[in-house]
Amino acid sequence: MAKTLPFPGGNQAARARQAKALLLPIPRSMAVELILPVHIALDALRRGAGSTSAVQTLTQTMLLTGFLCDLGYGEMTYEQLRTADQALAVTFERGRESGEWRFDEAHIELFSYIVSTYDAQLQRAPLSALTDASAQLDRIIANGDAQPTLRKQA
């Protein structure tokens, strides 16, 4: 059987395309596909029609948003993240105990800000930053750390 000769130029071109893609934001259609379930989860919790899944979606969104802010794509304070984390814990406990999956009125504005920030991050941050943030989230999930340590931002 004949062997093909390796052409280093082909692999080099593919690597160059990959490297370039990591520096660019994701396509708008992909950003819309990623943000739509987040908006749906926020709306469900706003209306009192949420679920465990909606709380999990917004927990992951809060963490990803924080990680991307740490990388320089957006602004959130430690206090905002801490308040959001506490609100999610209260919402989850209430939902488990009473079946009522909703945000308190005081937290809707904060989560609207988080979701809007995440939406902007998906449109502007390069793929490399999104990949890094996603890898951080994956590590938290793999470790079973339900309460990751939130870093104070300077």
What are these regions (language model features)?
Residues 1:
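BZIP DNA-binding basic region
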Residues 5-7:
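Short hydrophobic short-linear motifs embedded
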Residues 10-71:
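Short terminal alpha-helical segments
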Residues 23-27, 73-77, 96-100:
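A ubiquitous short alpha-helical element
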Residues 44-58, 96-112:
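Short, low-complexity cationic-aromatic patches
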Residues 59-90, 120-134:
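Extended intrinsically disordered, low-complexity coil regions enriched in Ser, Thr, Gly, Ala
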Residues 101-154:
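Amphipathic alpha-helical binding modules
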